[in-house]
Amino acid sequence: MISPLAYVDPSAKLGKNVTVHPFAYIDKNVEIGDDNEIMPYASLMSGTRMGNGNKVYQGAVIAADPQDFAYKGDDTLAIIGDNNVIRENAVIIRGTFPGHAT
């Protein structure tokens, strides 16, 4: 179920049985597997790759730009596996260098 109050970019790829709550944000270039739950105000930014069975709580941000002076704006990834719980206001940034991931 995707709330009509959530933003999901039309190019984002969502698996089966994904719940996206109101005010969640899912950017372009995002891939989400099956059985995930994205809570209100969570943000999955460009470069997010998420497996199955995860829960992302309020205010968490995944695949934000790296907080590293070496980052030059390259396309990098944040890869989240299966069956994780990402709690409130956690920040998981993307890799810093081209072809890298966290």
Language-model regions: role of each:
Residues G73, H100-A101:
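Disorder-to-helix initiation segments
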Residues R94-P98:
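Beta-rich strand-turn-strand
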Residues M1-P4:
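Extreme N-terminal starter segment of soluble prokaryotic enzymes
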Residues A6, A12, N17-V20, A24, ...:
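A structural motif detector for beta-strand N-caps
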Residues D65-D75:
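Short, flexible, glycine-rich and Lys/Arg-enriched loop motifs at helix boundaries
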